[in-house]
Amino acid sequence: YEIAQCLVGSEMCIRDSGGGNYEHSDMLASMKPGDKAVLLMVHFGTTHDDTRALTIDAINAKTQAAFPELKFQEAYTSRIIIRRLKERGITKLTPLYAMLKLRSEGYTHLIVQSTNIIDGVEMESLRRDVESALPFFKEIRVGTPLLYSIEDAEKVASILGNRYNAPAQSKKATKEHFVLVGHGTYTPSTAIYSQMDYMLKAGGLTNFHVGTIEGYPTFDTMLAQLKAGKAKRVTLIPFMFVAGDHAKNDIAGEWKEMLEKEGFTVSAQLEGLGQIPEIQEIFIDHIRFGLKHRMLDIMTKKAAYAAGKDTE
């Protein structure tokens, strides 16, 4: 059984397909008569109907259109959201329950794609669910979150710059500053947010800053950058797939108020990353790559090195 964690659009993947970290492996082409394949889209979830329609429902529809040959199923990871939706008569399955349900329906091959932004605790939880379900399927592959490779981050930086920065600077004499506010995490994966901040500035978007609610960069770190850049106008943008509770309460509420107390003119663009068509396409590319490639197990690679392969 295989768990393939697939990196999309990366030169490393292209170079290593057929060897190295990834190898070409067409999951659908390997299926035998009677086998059935399914795509499981996994979301953290939201109780906000308005933003769900613009993000989760939108990407669900887009992936179904992109992969008509696959059965489609969705799952939510947030037990709190699942419980609250159930109280409203809306049923959402957890990833493990969804996988076991699909196996009972005769599905043998599964590709799992989450809409997580970073490879943090939510991805860790998802992979554990997949490990629990592995014995019941012939193959399961797990796609990577939005920001996994350097190329992923470069694409996202370019998309956000084109979406917010270029229109703003063409209309305003005073340069506007943009703050991307992520959820953050207590794990080392929080470094991805600092990477994004660095890459935005390295790409010429010096008026873009990244902050997190529960990780690093902190509010104070971001505030120091705004002051160093002599910003006057600030737009807060959720760096999250869905603009739900955090966006409406923490970003448009607490963060906006704290910045206004510092003397900035502040607005909040309550748009989740999942609303942006180009961001949706990155997730679809991850699925596409996952169907055609799988990651080689590290012990398999070390065995090859021990047998005489020269590069490690």
List PLM regions with ranges.
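Single conserved hydrophobic/aromatic residue that forms the stacking wall/gate
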Residues: 1-9, 13-14
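Non-catalytic structural scaffold of enzyme domains
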Residues: 15-40, 47, 53-111, 123-217, ...
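Catalytic nucleophile-elbow at a beta strand-turn-alpha helix junction centered on a G-D-S/GDSL motif
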Residues: 6, 45-48
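Glycine-rich, histidine-containing beta strand-loop boundary motifs that form or position
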Residues: 114
